[in-house]
């Protein structure tokens, strides 16, 4: 039977398995009668079947197909934050919570609003607070026109300089107005007749276009007719205006916008461009939109002129301030060519009075009448002036320096004072002092010039005194006198002069000079400058000679007296030691060099031997300087290793002195330890005592023949007893032994004798007030005074204040019953930063009766104790 001949109601009863149903197809189609194939019979859809299919598609019953359903469940706040599955498949109800919230005893809340384009990536913490913070920061970062509520043509005082808000920060969600024309954003004019309400958006920017201007009754009177744009001229406009910048007024005034050229945005929104300097610019004059600043108002755009006419004109400055150009100074600008003088960095030099003639330091230049020119201060600490005279950045500086207005200096006034200079009321005394200082400096430079050109002669007597008094203790120069003379002859003239002057100044002064020799007349400042300007020291022999000269100057500075510590009489010893040690390390002398005994026996004055001897002399001087002044060590223990070759190279007493100096360095470390309890530590005490005992056992063979070595060992023992704060009777025994040895005629003169005298005097003065030890202490002080007076009559002058003079002065005061340091003041060489801690430090003393004297000894050293 043909399918087409069947009745209509019997079509549904035919079972065609291969024919796809309408539900399985994604779109309806038309069947072609001629496109039939075997096994395929098209199905004709009926209206009932279509209605049943439509009802099944739109059904929301739970028995419907899963694929056709949409996801309606969402997670709660806790599950979203933890990124776990939430079993709340339906909308949240009060009193109902998911399993996770019930487990943690939390409220199941659904505060997050689902987004249109799908769920967010995780839980956004504090979304409301972040949104409020972002909106608040956007409002605060966009400077709107101050004083937006006004009436008529009167603007508020704060709105005279309107600021421009960036276009990106404006919320342009005005979808209600559909305008096809291009919009132009510009600052709101200040001459609007009606009051602008606060709820208008945007508040500080107005969107101008032709259709909006016609439909707005409030803004139509304020917008001129040229603001209407034609479609032909809209393409030449930039999409956004630029920020206001300097140097753009000229480009705006030179623009000639005719009617045929179409409307162009104001060029005062263009970015700044570099302009050539054509003259001074008023600092207080800001670029504004006032028409009075235009060079040719007739050539400018009338639209912009009408828009800018509503802006108030800025006030004219009463006292304009001219700033110098920031680029290259002009040739005619005398202020830019002024160079700083040497006295501008001197704290003792005052400023030049206003009625004095113009000098390099007066900063007075010729400027136009009625105007003041800002001086270009050459001091590094002077800040760079800003554009505004009353800028907030200048107010803290002016209040700090008590300068009324340092950036409005008239041509008839004196320059502002430097903040680092100390001024006094007596200007004449300061000027006289500065003149005397300049005269002394000029004399010093003249002497340096003479020394630089002078060929110093060889003095055999002075060289012999060096080998007798210095070289036997500290072998600095060559062992051979002839070898030294030949090396000096080959050296450059300035280096040779510096070395010979250093030798003569050391041996021709107390306590080494005799009555028949006068002091060396050349000042040490000149010798030091001559040594510092020495050139042509690239050769190894010249560098060794330069190092030896610095060591000699360090010893001479130590012998000069207490005035060198305070800086009143030349450079201190620490300065020369630091320079010499720096040069030695630059020469790589701290690296251990292995010298064979054969090479030492063949040549004791080779370059390698001289370098090793100079290194060990620096080690000795560094240890004794650190202990005597409580200064840190320059050379660490890691670069010190005394070998048999070094002992052979140095000699008997210098090698033993090096070993003893290492113990002095250990005691100095204990004295300067940050923890004062280290001095009473039994382990530290036992270690130091074992080092001294080991040294004594190694020199027992020659102990009775070397009086100077006995004195040095006793000196170290006194330092140890003071370090551990021993009882007064224990410290008095080695101190009395030192006084006895010093008064002996067999004790030679060495560069370390003033150390022995000073330490013994400090201990005897400290225990003098104890009744049970006063007689013995008095006897020791008399021995030291007799020795000093006898030697001072031979080698010293009455007006020369060396170490012997200071020791003798203290002994006489104590013997006459005068109180010493009963209420002492802070020594002059103690810095002000540590003076408070020094004066208030409390330290228990079992050695001295006065605990303050013991504190003074521990903080300043035995040489600083005498000052």
UniProtKB/Swiss-Prot annotation:
Q: Where is the composition biased (Polar residues)?
A: 137-167, 248-257
**What GO cellular-component annotations does this UniProt entry give?**
nucleus
Q: For this UniProt entry, which segments traverse the membrane?
A: none
Q: Does the keyword Transcription regulation apply?
A: yes
- Give any Pfam family that matches: Zn_clus
A GO molecular-function term, please? DNA-binding transcription factor activity, RNA polymerase II-specific
Record InterPro entries: Carb_Metab_Trans_Reg, Transcription_factor_dom_fun, Zn2-C6_fun-type_DNA-bd_sf, Zn2Cys6_DnaBD
Chain residue ranges for the region called Disordered: 110-167, 217-257
Query: Which residues does UniProt assign to DNA binding?
Result: 76-108
SMART domains from the UniProt entry? GAL4
Protein name (record): Uncharacterized transcriptional regulatory protein C320.03
Which organism is this protein's natural source?
Schizosaccharomyces pombe (strain 972 / ATCC 24843) (Fission yeast)
